[in-house]
Design a protein with these regions (language model features):
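Acidic catalytic/metal-coordinating carboxylates
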Residues: 27-28, 51-55
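Acidic, metal-coordinating helix/loop segments flanking the phosphotransfer/catalytic sites
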Residues: 25-41
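Active-site residues of response regulator receiver
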Residues: 45
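Receiver (REC) domain active-site loop signature in two-component systems and cognate sites
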Residues: 48
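Alpha4 helix (beta4-alpha4-beta5 surface) of REC/receiver domains from two-component response regulators
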Residues: 55, 76-91, 102
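C-terminal output helix
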Residues: 95-105
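Charged docking surfaces used in two-component/phosphorelay signaling
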Residues: 10-14, 18
Length: 112
């Protein structure tokens, strides 16, 4: 999970851990690239310092990594941004817990 908002990271992590998932987090795209190592799924905020979601996605894909990316953003154009970076899905903040769990189940298990 890549998000610069610690409260979002805490809430999403708690939900996913309760559902039996492992969660690793990074505060920005640059940190996430350094940590990237065979993730089942990347939950990605688009507006972050240092390296934003667009930069992360470009470098992540250029490195040959193919983990699904789900954009998580409060911006009205979340769907368009997801399409622009080649993400498999998107969640518009604020999102419902059920939508988060469904997206993780769908994309992390390869049933998309």
């Amino acid at each position: 999970m890549v998000d610069d908002d610690p409260s979002i990271v805490a809430v999403v992590s708690d939900i996913l851990i309760a559902e039996g998932h492992e969660v690793d987090s990074a505060e920005n795209g640059a940190e996430a690239l350094m940590k990237a190592n065979g993730e089942a799924l990347v939950l990605l905020d688009m507006r972050m310092p240092v390296l934003d979601g667009w930069g992360f996605a470009r470098e992540f894909r250029a490195s040959g990594k193919r983990s699904p990316i789900v954009v998580m953003t409060a911006a009205e154009n979340a769907r368009r941004w997801a399409e622009e970076i080649g993400a498999e899905g998107y969640l518009a903040k604020p999102f419902e817990i059920d939508a988060l769990i469904a997206a993780v189940e769908r994309y992390a298990t390869g049933t998309h």
